[in-house]
């Protein structure tokens, strides 16, 4: 066994030699492990090598380079991203869309601060980068953690991937605060995006739709080596937790970021009136097409940090900032075809196939047409030149045809009366109450229709249903195509059948022993599931998450629901029992009865219940201190997620509302609480902290 010298006793030359030797060893072990599945050292020995390598770089920062293993190579692909709670929430901005609203924003700020029209008020203006928000945490000047924005309160740990972005320093320059969270945007330039797509196409891989999606997808790769091969960039523009603020203004903070070695946007400018802001907005708008990165507006922020703190927050956005969005972009292109897609419930959805055209830096080749009435109302025909509009990340829509360019032989579009997948009749159901036809035409093929089967399987495995890691949409489509999965039952017998099969799943393209083992473990972990998620996973029409929870709460067990629903003919006591469930009605009751009355569904359920156990709904605590009360949660929760808080409150007999009203009994407020807290004070509603809530409910 080699005795290692203490790192503090090494000379720079000795450290450099050991660093190079360790790098070569780790690279070789990575190759043996990830490419040849033939490791020669134990996990503990490998980890010891990595720790020594990283300790050398910490003690001798000059060893860190673009080729450093801690920067971009050798990190194992993660099974999934760990969650990180933002100590200071990464809240979104309110949007404005006109010059008039700029004046209103400035006037609103002045009113809140009690400033007269002539009192000085400085506001910064900067381009709104169209990328992925990211938070970088530095401690002692070193990058220790990076997280995506997520929902603003909880993001994903992407530290290993962020370390591969060359513009982001691993160590800040100068005298940075002991703790500093830098917020900014990860993006991809137009030139890099085009080059990446050329490489993707040459390799026969997926072409990315736009630079933003490409940047987001690249940063969220489970394998940091993939991210390292993607040309990502970063602009710093805000901060979260900071042990001290190196400046007292927004512009000063950004200047400090630049001094620390962080990239900042050069188009940021200080303005002193609404007129200045509007002029800078239109100046940036005019330059937009010349920039090598996407922007979708201009962000205005009150410059004084002291005034920012006085202004505070409203709802999920700061009162001291707003985003002035650019108007929706339009273009004219050829409508090549109209294709019909069939969804999980049989809905036939028309999709426009367009001659590809670039709109706002994004290549658009598809657009939504909504339904057949929309096509008829706009008189859209195949072969038309059509005006399309794209606003932000919204799916492009067709505004209408350019009639003076319509071909003479263009015919009115005839919406199909049969399903294009299975050939079953496609009908528009009649509402028995109003006698009007549904706007959606649906395939009547049910489980005979392959398109519906695939979509139902996707729904079954989706996040809010069984949430099976590694069984996404693409995997389900492939497994269905290969005959491996046709019903939900097949998911839970996949491992057993694979063991007997001559063609193993691990030998298929895109799979290996590790990925297959992980998939089987993920499936096994879902053999016990809360009954409300089980009900939701079945994909019963009109039964979303809320109605699934209502059914579970009303009947307690799946067997009880099934027994009632199977006998719930029109006019029966069981139908009344279904109809009287809180939030239900005749339409939902009819849909549930239809589902359980269909013999194929009963057969699938019988097989599924041999594989899976729906766990009964916990009984509501009728004697808890919050039973029967309406509760609102607002702000950032530090001890539980919003979903966990909601589930806990409902389990204790409370009703959770999304807004504060006279019917609200209690508001639980965390950091960043805004308008809901103010509304509660206005209505004299009891408000408590998250800690007080946990004491109240005894958890």
Curated annotation (Swiss-Prot):
Catalysis performed (reactions): NAD(+) + (deoxyribonucleotide)n-3'-hydroxyl + 5'-phospho-(deoxyribonucleotide)m = (deoxyribonucleotide)n+m + AMP + beta-nicotinamide D-nucleotide
Organism: Beijerinckia indica subsp. indica (strain ATCC 9039 / DSM 1715 / NCIMB 8712)
UniProt-listed Enzyme Commission number(s): 6.5.1.2
Biological role stated in the UniProt entry: DNA ligase that catalyzes the formation of phosphodiester linkages between 5'-phosphoryl and 3'-hydroxyl groups in double-stranded DNA using NAD as a coenzyme and as the energy source for the reaction. It is essential for DNA replication and repair of damaged DNA.
Molecular-function GO terms, alphabetical: DNA ligase (NAD+) activity; metal ion binding
Listed GO biological process terms: DNA repair; DNA replication
NCBIfam families xrefs: dnlj, PRK07956.1
Cofactor(s) annotated in UniProt: Mg(2+); Mn(2+)
Family statement drawn from the similarity comment of this UniProt entry: Belongs to the NAD-dependent DNA ligase family. LigA subfamily.
Keyword vocabulary terms for this entry: DNA damage, DNA repair, DNA replication, Ligase, Magnesium, Manganese, Metal-binding, NAD, Zinc
Broad class of enzyme this protein falls into: ligase
Record gene name: ligA
Signal sequence, renumbered to the chain: none
Record protein name field: DNA ligase
Entry's Gene Ontology cellular component terms: cytosol
């Amino acid at each position: 066994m080699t005795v290692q010298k203490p790192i503090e006793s090494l000379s720079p030359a000795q450290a450099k030699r050991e660093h190079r030797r360790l790098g070569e060893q780790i690279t070789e072990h990575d190759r043996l492990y990830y490419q040849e599945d033939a490791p020669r050292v134990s996990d503990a020995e490998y980890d010891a090598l990595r720790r020594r390598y990283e300790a050398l770089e910490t003690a001798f920062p000059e060893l860190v380079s673009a080729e450093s293993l801690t920067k971009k190579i050798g990190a194992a692909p993660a099974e999934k991203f760990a969650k990180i709670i933002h100590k200071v929430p990464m809240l979104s901005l309110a949007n404005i869309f006109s010059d008039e609203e700029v004046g209103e924003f400035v006037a609103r700020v002045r009113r809140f601060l009690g400033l007269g029209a002539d009192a000085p008020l400085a506001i910064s203006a900067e381009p709104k980068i169209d990328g992925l928000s990211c938070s970088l945490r530095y401690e002692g000047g070193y990058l220790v953690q990076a997280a995506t924005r997520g929902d603003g309160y909880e993001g994903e740990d992407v530290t290993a991937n962020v370390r591969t972005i060359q513009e982001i320093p691993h160590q800040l320059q100068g005298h940075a605060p002991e703790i500093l969270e830098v917020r900014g945007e990860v993006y991809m330039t137009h030139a890099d995006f085009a080059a990446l797509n050329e490489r993707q196409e040459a390799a026969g891989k997926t072409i990315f739709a736009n630079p933003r999606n490409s940047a987001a997808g690249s940063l969220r790769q489970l394998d940091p080596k993939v991210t390292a091969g993607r040309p990502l960039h970063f602009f710093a523009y805000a901060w979260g937790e900071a042990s001290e603020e190196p400046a007292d203004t927004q512009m000063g903070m950004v200047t400090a970021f630049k001094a620390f070695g962080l990239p900042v946007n050069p188009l940021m400018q200080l303005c002193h009136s609404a007129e200045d802001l509007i002029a800078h907005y239109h100046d940036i708008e005019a330059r937009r097409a010349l920039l090598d990165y996407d922007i979708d507006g201009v962000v205005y922020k009150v410059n004084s940090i002291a005034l920012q703190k006085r202004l505070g927050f409203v709802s999920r956005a700061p009162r001291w900032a707003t985003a002035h969005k650019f108007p929706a972009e339009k273009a004219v292109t050829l409508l090549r075809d109209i294709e019909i897609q069939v969804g999980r419930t049989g809905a036939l959805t028309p999709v426009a196939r367009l001659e590809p055209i670039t709109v706002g830096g994004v290549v658009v080749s598809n657009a939504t047409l909504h339904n057949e009435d929309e096509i008829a109302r706009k008189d859209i025909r195949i072969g038309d030149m059509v005006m399309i509009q794209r606003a932000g990340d919204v799916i492009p829509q067709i505004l209408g045809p350019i009639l003076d360019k319509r071909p003479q032989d263009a015919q009115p579009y005839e919406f199909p009366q049969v399903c294009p997948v299975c050939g079953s009749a496609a009908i528009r159901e009649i509402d028995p109450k109003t006698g009007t036809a549904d706007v959606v035409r649906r395939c009547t093929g049910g489980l005979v229709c392959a398109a519906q089967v695939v979509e139902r399987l996707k729904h079954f495995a989706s996040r809010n249903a069984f949430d099976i890691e590694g069984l996404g949409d693409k995997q389900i489509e492939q497994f269905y195509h290969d005959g491996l999965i046709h019903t939900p039952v097949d998911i839970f017998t996949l491992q057993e059948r694979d063991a007997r099969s001559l063609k193993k799943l691990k030998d298929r393209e895109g799979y290996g022993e590790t990925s297959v083992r992980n998939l089987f473990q993920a499936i096994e972990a879902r053999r016990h599931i809360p009954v409300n998620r089980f009900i939701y996973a079945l994909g019963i029409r009109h039964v979303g998450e809320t109605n699934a929870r209502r059914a579970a709460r009303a009947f307690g067990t799946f067997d009880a629901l099934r027994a009632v629903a199977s006998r719930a003919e029109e006019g029966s006591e069981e139908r009344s029992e279904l109809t009287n469930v809180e939030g239900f009605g005749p339409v939902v009751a009819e849909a549930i009865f239809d589902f359980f009355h269909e013999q194929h569904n009963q057969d699938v359920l019988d097989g599924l219940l041999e594989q899976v156990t729906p766990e009964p709904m916990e009984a509501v605590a009728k004697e808890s201190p919050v039973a029967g009360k309406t509760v609102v949660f607002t702000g950032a929760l530090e001890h539980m997620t919003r979903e966990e808080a909601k589930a806990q409150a409902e389990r204790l007999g409370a009703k959770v509302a999304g807004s504060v009203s006279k019917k609200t009994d209690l508001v639980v407020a965390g950091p960043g609480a805004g308008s809901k807290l103010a509304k509660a004070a206005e209505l004299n509603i009891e408000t408590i902290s998250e800690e007080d809530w946990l004491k109240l409910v005894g958890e």
